[in-house]
Design a protein with these regions (language model features):
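Acidic/His- and Gly-rich active-site-bordering loop/insert found
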Residues: 123-226
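Zn-dependent metallopeptidase/amidohydrolase metal-coordination segment
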Residues: 126, 134, 461, 468-484, ...
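A short beta-alpha structural unit
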Residues: 139-143, 374, 385, 420-435, ...
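Active-site metal-coordination/substrate-binding segment of hydrolases
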Residues: 187-285, 307, 311-313, 320-323, ...
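A glycine-rich helix N-cap at a beta->alpha junction
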Residues: 277-303, 403-409
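His/Asp/Glu-rich mid-to-C-terminal helical/loop segments that flank catalytic regions of hydrolases
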Residues: 280, 344-361, 393-394, 441-450, ...
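Acidic-enriched catalytic cores of C-N bond-cleaving enzymes acting on peptides and small amides
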Residues: 317-321, 340-370, 391-470, 509
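Active-site-adjacent substrate-binding region
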Residues: 346-369, 526-569
């Protein structure tokens, strides 16, 4: 029995007594009179079904939309594309050492596959996924709840792993872990290389799933092509990086230089682990970040960002009237860095729009307004509870909601075809007393949300279709004395990031709101000439026959922060294909994971010679 199997068996047996059989499920609702919005055009599906996202070959024009080629990024594009074999200086491609390394590693893989096993076991389902070691580790870390701010257990798991393998390691007070492995035989003189990924995940779930993701393990499922979770985020971002690093540390057959595997905490909530990580003892000056989500893409730069928290205070008073409950859901959401240029709907802003329309149909006050769960994710659903205190017409309100639902169904028929708007009167015409914000404060809150910038602010003039600056409202939540809005500012230009922070400050001042800026991190700037990046691109081309796309991205990575801590640190970021990260629709491509892992092993072998 391997270390991880023993560790997890002990953990499961010790946690049996901690299970709570009386997990709280959703409260039963009293039947309520519902405005039949579903009978309106809000539920009308587009005449032409929108096809699912497809994986696009790296050499197509769509790939350029994700980023920009290396030549365009540094302004060195030539009129005639150089042959692939000319990537390596000096010897022709057929004599290049990289080609020898690729062939040698692949030959070892084939030899291992041809060795007859003493006893053949037929594996199915999750157990049959390849690479077996990578997905074995992925299953085990997925069984350990590890949402942001709840990573102590997985940090302990990594620490125990290092101890059992007699690897030197460091675990700091935040929970960051660095595990060092010696070079393989014959590679002791090679320069060390660092691998890096984060151990926290975004915890999002469908409303129908009662799971407590802080305490309960997610349920993995697969169709053989994709790995998903049952109505929750998968944690492929960045669990696949953790699994690959553990598999590499545990594999004595690979050829590699000395490895330093850096596991950071709380990346998803402002790169907090990377902020606090002491890298003074790091020997590596080359780092492979494993937090990218497109196979065949080598990321060389990313935007910087900051979390902005705006608070609007308000006084609650006792109000007598009839309550209307409104809900908007069915949106696609997504990572606010990667999907902000897709034009997807923001549930918080849609709800603010509807409340603004309803102001002309009667006087009401806000009891509650809540939407979104993560500052770095586009909100998929939002809900509000309001109380009408003056004269109003139910029929006019019904018509307003239905018309609004019809309007947004048309607006977002391509990006969010499943938007649903519902509104109901829970008290069925009876008035009652409730504590709500005053009319003036309610109007101020709605207008602040309406005035708040959102989406792509400016596109890059250098990199086609890549946002340069953006702002995404992620969370709106009601407190006892006001509402709180969490947003994410991103920009590849630090001065423009500051401009957006100043712009938000001006809006907040006009609405008498306070502002707090947290989790600021710098942009990871492009290194124009990188031998390490060139080697990574060359190895990929030799291995696959496809030239990789070297790009910049609008999402945030830890590379910028880490590179600032280690002078001369040259970083790249790679990863397998993942889709819909930060949403319950998140999925990880299994064949892509296998290819990426093979590429990583060959690249490490090449680094042993470089």
């Amino acid at each position: 029995m391997s270390f991880v199997e023993k560790w997890w068996k002990m953990r499961k047996s010790s946690s049996v007594t901690e299970e709570n059989p009386e997990a709280e499920g959703p409260a039963a609702e009293t039947p309520a009179e519902e405005i039949p919005v579903e009978e309106t055009a809000a539920e009308v599906t587009p005449a032409e079904e929108v096809p699912a996202e497809e994986t696009v070959p790296a050499e197509t024009a769509e790939d350029a939309a994700k980023g920009i080629s290396l030549e365009e990024a540094v302004g060195e594009a030539s009129e005639e594309e150089a042959p692939a074999q000319d990537i390596v200086d000096g010897a022709p491609a057929e004599e290049a050492p990289v080609q020898d390394i690729v062939e040698e590693v692949l030959a070892e893989e084939v030899s291992a596959e041809e060795t007859p096993a003493e006893e053949e076991t037929v594996l199915t389902g999750l157990d049959a996924l390849e690479p077996a070691d990578v997905f074995r580790y992925f299953r085990e870390i997925s069984a350990i709840p590890h949402g942001s701010f709840h990573t102590t257990a997985i940090s302990s798991y990594l620490e125990d792993f290092a101890k059992s393998h007699d690897f030197s390691y460091i675990r700091d007070e935040l929970g960051n872990v660095i595990i060092s492995r010696p070079a393989s035989a014959g590679c002791e003189g090679a320069a060390p290389i660092a691998l890096q990924g984060h151990i926290d995940m975004v915890c999002e779930k469908e409303a129908s799933n009662p799971i407590d993701m802080e305490k309960e393990a997610i349920t993995l499922q697969t169709d053989g092509e994709w790995l998903t979770a049952d109505r929750t985020t998968l944690g492929g971002d960045d669990g696949i990086a953790v699994a690959m690093m553990l598999a590499l540390l545990d594999d004595d057959s690979i050829t590699c230089p000395p490895l330093e595997c850096v596991f950071t905490v709380d990346e998803e909530v402002g790169l907090l682990g990377a902020y606090g990580l002491d890298l003074s003892s790091l020997k590596s000056r080359r780092m492979i970040n494993l937090d990218s989500e497109d196979e065949g893409v080598i990321t060389a730069s990313c935007a910087g960002g900051a979390e902005v928290i705006c608070t609007l205070s308000g006084k609650r008073r006792e109000k007598n009237g009839e309550i209307l409950e409104i809900r908007i859901d069915g949106l696609r959401g997504g990572h606010s860095g990667e999907k902000i240029n897709c034009g997807r709907a923001n549930a918080d802003l849609l709800l603010a729009r509807l409340l603004y329309r309803l102001e002309g149909k009667g006087k009401f006050c806000i009891i509650g307004f809540n939407g979104g769960n993560r500052d770095n994710a586009i909100p998929r659903e939002a809900r509000a509870e309001i109380i009408f205190t003056g004269k109003y017409s139910r029929s006019e309100i019904k018509e307003t909601v239905a018309t609004f639902a019809e309007d947004i169904a048309k607006e977002y028929s391509v990006t969010d075809p499943d938007i649903h708007v519902s509104a109901k009167w829970p008290n069925k015409g009876r008035k009652s007393l409730h504590i709500a914000f005053g009319r003036k404060d309610s109007r101020r809150m709605i207008r602040f949300l309406m005035a708040f910038p959102n989406g792509v602010i400016e596109y890059s003039p250098l990199y086609r279709d890549v946002p340069q600056t953006s702002l995404s409202m992620g969370i709106v939540k009601t407190m006892a004395d006001g509402i709180c809005i969490h947003s994410m500012v991103r920009s590849s230009i630090n001065s423009q990031k500051q401009m957006m922070l100043d712009r938000i400050a001006c809006i907040a001042e006009e609405f008498d709101a306070s502002i707090d800026i947290k989790g600021t991190y710098p942009a990871w700037e492009l290194i124009e000439k990188s031998d390490f990046r060139d080697l990574a691109a060359e190895v990929y081309q030799k291995l696959t026959g496809i030239e990789p796309v070297v790009c910049v991205i609008h999402g945030g990575l830890e590379c910028g922060l880490l590179a600032a801590k280690v002078p001369g640190l040259d970083c790249i970021s790679i990863g397998p294909d993942m889709e819909e990260v930060h949403t319950p629709a998140e999925r990880l491509n299994i064949p892509s994971s296998k290819r990426t892992y093979e590429y990583l092993k060959v690249l490490l072998a090449a680094c042993s010679e470089a």
